[in-house]
């Protein structure tokens, strides 16, 4: 009887741990005719979603930290990290994102026509004194040793020069673009 109880306890612990993280691999068409691989990790214990886009010089990592309320994105070809306060009206809840990814992976036909444009000004928005406790450890691990810029939601796409925007895969599907806010 003790063995059965011990077995059930171990089984329930493993089941809880297996539900803590869920990984989705998605392939979307790239601009050059090939496919772009995206790996999305949903961590229900940390309340985060980490999106890795594997696309050569356009590769990026984005963390949605629902516990602290921030989104950080690092385009790997640039030595910079971009951070924005999460707008819970514009960004789906973690469980909805998880459901969307499941449907995207299984149906491979979901898309959004709404876009959230994020702009930053590299001359004005550099964050020099960073309170990592505010942003949380997942974002700290992503952005600690590179310049960090504060982004803001642009209410109209005309506020940003769309030629300098990064929008790939899941970020594009969720309607998020990162754009430089400099107009010459």
UniProtKB/Swiss-Prot annotation:
InterPro entries: BRICHOS_dom (IPR007084), Gastrokine (IPR051772)
A GO CC term assigned to this protein in UniProt: extracellular space
Main location: secreted
Pfam families to which the protein is assigned, alphabetical: BRICHOS
Domain BRICHOS residues, every copy: 54-151
SMART domains, alphabetized: BRICHOS (SM01039)
Nucleotidyltransferase in keyword set: no
Location(s) in or outside the cell: Secreted
Subunit and partners: Heterodimer with TFF1; disulfide linked. Interacts with TFF2.
This protein's name: Gastrokine-2
